């Protein structure tokens, strides 16, 4: 393996820019590129991020806005369009203590800095601590942005070195993304929460149990939804199209689910309530079902929220095992709902009667007509999972930052007390001191 550290003045090298003000061309001088072969191993960033022997040339990044305005410091890395290279990992030696890496708007990871050395800022004549931090990306990319984090809302960040690990862009397509939730280490998250004295809410615990079950069974969300919804009832769909009451249905309509006009919330709610009421009736009262009409509404009524409310009202009951709705009647209801969603006709005067399908034995794969529904539900669950993971990681990072600040303040206070002339000699016992502070879990 050949490794070479080069200056950033190459034509094919990535460009380095910042959201804060810097001297023209000064930021590019701090960029160092490390190119390796396609099968390269991890680099030794401990050595690459070591400060230069002759003293680092610091590049100053300053915010042009007032401290009251929220203006984080971002630096942007982007490979050339014709360079044929991709970024594997990135490391920074700067006065910012931590950094966060984003691929577009997606959070990739956080790297906490390690104190390397103390240098003297020539402009301010102050001692500056430099921290080195690096992060290996989960998947290679041609561009990323890095958020530099400093304590105390610093309006100036000094950068000594930016090291980027590059390799030739692979001709093979990137592998498919892992199953939903497979990258989440639930045991590690729960251990961190317990060590901080916090407990998960019942809703968060239920969500983690669902993710753990999905990880253990290695089933994609699409397969799980298909196992719940079962067959769409292709024969039932043909019966709907051939029946006189369903003549208004447009057979050629193939508009995807998210952009189709919506069902009224009352229609979905009444259907679900009627099904539950029917299941709770005594067996002697018969088994009759009222046919409710489904009305088409304008585009401003969201079908997405209606469907999410209907499905969310069903899922907790089914998961808890306390639902009285029999599966033989619940499955046809969901199948009919999916068929109606996929075959609605855009129009203000169009109405059609909902048919009740017979219970079907067993479940098979969802045909092509229902694929938009499963795909849309999968996107909703994936988005909620990503939002939960980001919020949890942000909360953990904030708590760790607060803990670091607290420890640093106490250590500085302890050092000052030991250096003061009134401090006791090493041979004398120390007096007991109670700060009266309590931990978050109530212990002292």
From Swiss-Prot:
Record's subcellular location: Cytoplasm; Mitochondrion
Biased composition (Basic and acidic residues): 431-444
One CC-aspect GO term: cytoplasm
Record-listed E.C. numbers: 3.6.1.-
A molecular-function term among this protein's GO annotations: ATP hydrolysis activity
Reactions this protein catalyses: ATP + H2O = ADP + phosphate + H(+)
Residues found modified as Phosphoserine: 177, 182, 254, 302
Chain residue ranges for the region called Disordered: 424-444
InterPro entries: PAAT-like
Coiled-coil positions: none
Assigned keywords, A-Z: Cytoplasm, Hydrolase, Mitochondrion, Phosphoprotein
Lineage: superkingdom: Eukaryota
Function in brief: ATPase that regulates mitochondrial ABC transporters ABCB7, ABCB8/MITOSUR and ABCB10. Regulates mitochondrial ferric concentration and heme biosynthesis and plays a role in the maintenance of mitochondrial homeostasis and cell survival.
Assembly and binders: Homodimer. Interacts with ABCB7, ABCB8/MITOSUR and ABCB10.
Name of the protein this chain belongs to: ATPase PAAT
């Amino acid at each position: 393996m050949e490794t070479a550290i080069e200056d950033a003045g190459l034509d094919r090298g990535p460009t380095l820019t910042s959201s804060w003000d810097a001297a023209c061309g000064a930021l590019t001088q701090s960029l160092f590129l490390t190119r390796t072969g396609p099968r390269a191993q991890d680099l030794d960033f401990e050595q690459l991020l070591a400060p230069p022997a002759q003293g680092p040339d610091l590049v100053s990044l300053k915010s042009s806005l007032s401290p009251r305005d929220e203006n984080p410091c971002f630096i942007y890395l982007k490979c050339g369009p014709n360079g044929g290279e991709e970024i594997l990992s990135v490391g920074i030696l700067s006065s910012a203590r931590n950094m966060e890496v984003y691929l577009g708007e997606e959070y990739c990871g956080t790297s906490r800095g390690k104190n390397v050395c103390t240098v003297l800022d020539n402009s301010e004549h102050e001692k500056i601590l430099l921290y080195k931090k690096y992060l290996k990306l989960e998947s290679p990319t041609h561009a990323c942005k890095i958020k530099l984090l400093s304590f105390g809302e610093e309006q100036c960040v000094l950068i000594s070195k930016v090291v980027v690990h590059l390799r030739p862009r692979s001709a093979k397509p990137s592998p498919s993304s892992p199953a939903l939730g497979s990258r989440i280490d639930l045991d590690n998250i729960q251990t961190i929460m317990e060590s901080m004295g916090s407990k998960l809410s019942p809703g968060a615990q239920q969500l983690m149990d669902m993710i753990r079950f999905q990880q253990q069974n290695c089933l994609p969300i699409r397969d799980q939804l298909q196992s719940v919804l079962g067959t769409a009832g292709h024969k039932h769909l043909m019966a709907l199209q051939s029946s006189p009451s369903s003549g208004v249905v447009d057979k050629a309509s193939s508009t995807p689910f998210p952009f189709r006009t919506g069902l009224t919330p009352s229609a979905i709610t009444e259907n679900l309530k009627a099904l539950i009421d029917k299941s709770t009736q005594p067996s002697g009262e018969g088994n009759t079902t009222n046919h409710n009409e489904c009305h088409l509404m304008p585009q401003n009524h969201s079908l997405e929220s209606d469907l999410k409310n209907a499905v969310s009202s069903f899922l907790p009951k089914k998961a808890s095992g306390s639902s009285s709705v029999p599966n033989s009647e619940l499955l046809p209801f969901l199948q009919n709902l999916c068929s109606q969603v996929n075959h609605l006709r855009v129009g203000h005067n169009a109405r059609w009667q909902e048919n009740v399908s017979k219970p079907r034995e067993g479940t098979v794969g969802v045909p092509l007509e229902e694929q938009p529904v499963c795909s849309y539900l999968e996107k909703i669950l994936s988005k909620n999972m990503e939002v939960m993971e980001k919020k949890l990681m942000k909360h953990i990072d904030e708590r760790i930052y607060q803990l670091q600040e607290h420890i640093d303040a106490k250590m500085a206070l302890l050092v000052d007390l030991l250096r003061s002339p009134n401090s006791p000699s090493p041979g004398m016992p120390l007096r007991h001191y109670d700060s009266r502070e309590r931990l978050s879990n109530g212990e002292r």
